[in-house]
């Protein structure tokens, strides 16, 4: 197993000086796709074990945890976005 740098995580929410609405939406879509990839990779490893292929147990557990953490992060980001949206809707014009 190869151990790489910690910089492999995509820089999805970098702070930019001129942030446009489209960029935020595009970043969120990229983030959702990244989480989906983690979920699919975990699912493929689990299916490989069920098919009888030789897959190390630690790889399955690690990928399952990565998928779980990514999904939990996505849920928290969604909750914060909804909370911000609700606060904006409560503001009086």
UniProtKB/Swiss-Prot annotation:
Q: Which UniProt keywords apply?
A: Bacterial flagellum
Give yes or no: UniProt keyword Repressor. no
GO BP term (any one): bacterial-type flagellum assembly
Asked if the keyword Transport belongs to this entry, the reply reads no
- MF terms (GO), sorted A to Z: cytoskeletal motor activity; structural molecule activity
Q: Could you tell me which PANTHER family the record lists for this protein?
A: FLAGELLAR HOOK-BASAL BODY COMPLEX PROTEIN FLIE, PTHR34653
Q: Which family does it belong to?
A: Belongs to the FliE family.
Q: Indicate what this protein is called per its UniProt record.
A: Flagellar hook-basal body complex protein FliE
Report the gene name.
Answer: fliE
């Amino acid at each position: 197993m190869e151990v790489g740098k910690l910089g492999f995580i995509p820089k999805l929410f970098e702070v930019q000086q001129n942030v446009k609405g489209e960029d935020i939406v595009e970043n969120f879509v990229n983030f959702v796709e990244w989480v989906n990839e983690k979920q699919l990779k975990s699912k493929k490893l689990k299916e490989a074990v069920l098919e009888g292929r030789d897959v190390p147990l630690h790889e399955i557990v690690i990928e399952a945890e990565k998928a779980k953490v990514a999904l939990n992060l996505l849920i928290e980001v969604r909750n914060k976005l909804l909370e911000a949206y609700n606060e904006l809707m409560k503001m009086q014009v």
